[in-house]
């Protein structure tokens, strides 16, 4: 029996980037995509990319269109970097109006377009929601 094939597109969470014990970013050897693949016996091609936004995913889509078209499912995890702000600008001008890297309207339009492009390639898009941000200090005993 053939393994279910998945292509994963997204940002550093998809890639499995963590802050290691030396306070440096590195790719975890237990990324959640690897765990899903092992637990559900799926072949997952992970094209997550550090810092990726919905605007930059069109290049990734073009580069991996063949993999997507041969995948049963395509996991999409975007939004974490899109909703980020220019924090230096906010610190320098805290009373000004500030907008995220990608506005809601643009994000929605580009995400809907991405979903349709994946469908057009013959894969079923699966949208993955961002995990909640929980400070490590909020749970010191865990």
What are these regions (language model features)?
Residues 62-142:
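Alpha-helical cap/lid subdomain in secreted, periplasmic
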Residues 52-62:
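Structural motif
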Residues 16-27, 48-53, 89-101:
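Acidic/histidine-rich helix-loop elements
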Residues 6-9, 13, 32, 36, ...:
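Generic hydrophobic secondary-structure signal
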Residues 1-48, 64-70:
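Serine-esterase "nucleophile elbow" of acetyl-processing enzymes
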Residues 12-15, 52-54, 81-83, 133-135:
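Active-site loop signature of alpha/beta-hydrolase-fold enzymes
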């Amino acid at each position: 029996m053939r393994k279910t094939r998945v292509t994963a597109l997204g940002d550093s969470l998809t890639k499995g980037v963590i802050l290691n014990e030396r306070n440096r970013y590195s790719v975890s050897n237990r990324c959640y995509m690897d765990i899903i693949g092992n637990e559900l016996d799926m072949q997952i091609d992970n094209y997550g990319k550090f810092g990726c936004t919905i605007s930059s995913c069109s290049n990734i889509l073009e580069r991996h269109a063949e993999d997507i078209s041969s995948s049963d499912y395509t996991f999409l995890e975007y939004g974490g970097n899109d909703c980020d702000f220019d924090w230096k600008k906010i610190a320098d001008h805290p009373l000004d109006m500030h907008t995220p890297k990608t506005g809601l309207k643009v994000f929605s339009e580009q995400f809907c377009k991405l979903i349709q492009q994946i469908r057009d390639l013959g894969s079923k898009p699966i949208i993955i929601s961002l995990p909640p941000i929980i400070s490590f200090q909020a749970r010191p005993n865990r």
